[in-house]
Regions:
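Short helices/loops that flank or line small-molecule/ion binding pockets
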Residues: 89-90, 98-99, 103-117, 130-132, ...
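Periplasmic-binding protein-like
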Residues: 139-146, 211, 215, 219-257, ...
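Ligand-binding clefts/hinges and TM-proximal coupling segments of bilobed small-molecule sensing domains
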Residues: 40, 45, 170-190, 225-229, ...
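Flexible hinge/capping segments at coil-to-helix
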Residues: 28, 146-163
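Extended ligand-binding regions for polar small-molecule ligands
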Residues: 81-90, 162, 169, 215, ...
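A ligand-binding cleft/hinge motif common to bilobed small-molecule-binding domains
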Residues: 121-129, 174-177, 200-201, 205-234
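Extracytoplasmic small-molecule ligand-binding "clamshell" domains
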Residues: 42-120
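Bacterial lipoprotein signal-peptidase II cleavage site
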Residues: 17-37
């Protein structure tokens, strides 16, 4: 069929592509990943087979140090980046990291724009009810971050104040579930790092976000030296989410077992200052 495409149509396609701009957007990359694997989807007997037939695991993430981020040398790295790469080696596939909108992560997962959500994702009741998840692999907590010098005794001090969190995140859920924080002026942001920017700039009084990110990005020697953790709201754990009913989650659990046994996961936890789940 390709031989029958006319020069007119080829030109039209070129104009259409040019109108889209230069660099590919996240949605463009995700759409390409989904369409490029259509044949595998039709023939695969299971979700794991589908992934293996494609030869790659498409991983949805947001920029989040120390889990998935670009370091000073320009290398894409992080605890989850390295762990996912090690798991993919066990599965015999290549990792492909696609930046997503965290608030629509399950929608992108179900649409097969991505194969999994692997980005310091809290194992909430909602996630576990709507996806197939791995066992917990790392510990975390939701914390309150404010500017140094801010008077803070409890979440009651934030009633009526501006509080930010990432849309669709465990931080947002923590705000909604706290009697005092629920009375704050809540503003959602696209990513957790934007929350730190708002507090540092003084446009927000506090942020609720992951302890792992706060430990990596605030305090002495960081870009956010003026910020500090003042409260820990709740303990939680991270896991990886696949499509509901997927057998790939169990395969990743098996890979985790091997990577724990050979010391890989502990070495990564020490490298990125994280605590592995029990």
């Amino acid at each position: 069929m390709k031989r029958l495409v006319s020069a007119f149509l080829a030109g039209a396609m070129a104009l259409s592509l040019a109108a889209c701009g230069g660099a590919a957007s996240t949605s463009t990359v995700a759409s390409s990943a989904a369409s490029g694997s259509a044949a595998a989807s039709e023939t695969a007997a299971s979700d794991l087979d589908y992934i293996k037939e494609k030869g790659k695991l498409v991983i949805g993430y947001t920029v989040y140090e120390p889990m998935n981020y670009t370091d000073a040398d320009g290398s894409f790295t992080g605890f989850d980046t390295e762990l996912a790469t090690a798991v993919c080696e066990k599965l015999g596939v290549e990792p492909e990291f696609v930046e997503i909108n965290w608030d629509t992560k399950v929608v992108e997962l179900d649409a097969k724009s991505i194969d999994c959500i692997w980005n310091g994702m809290t194992l909430t009741d909602d996630i576990m009810a709507n996806t197939a998840t791995t066992r917990a692999y790392a510990k975390n907590a939701q914390v309150v971050v404010v500017k140094d010098g801010t008077d803070y005794a409890s979440t009651a001090d934030l009633v009526g104040k501006t509080v930010v969190a990432e849309a669709g995140s465990a931080g947002e859920a923590a705000i909604e579930g706290d009697e005092d924080l629920a009375q704050a002026d809540y503003v959602s942001k696209s990513v957790q790092t934007d929350c730190l920017m708002e507090v540092a700039a003084g446009t927000a009084d506090a942020a609720v976000l992951d302890l792992t990110l706060a430990n990596a990005m605030i305090g002495e020697g960081t870009d956010y030296a003026s910020l500090k953790i003042v409260d820990e709201l709740n303990a939680e754990e991270y896991g990886v989410a696949f499509r509901k009913g997927s057998d790939a989650a169990a395969a990743v659990d098996a890979a985790f077992d091997e990577l724990k046994a050979d010391g890989t996961m502990q070495a990564l936890a020490e490298k990125y200052d994280l605590a592995l789940a029990d």
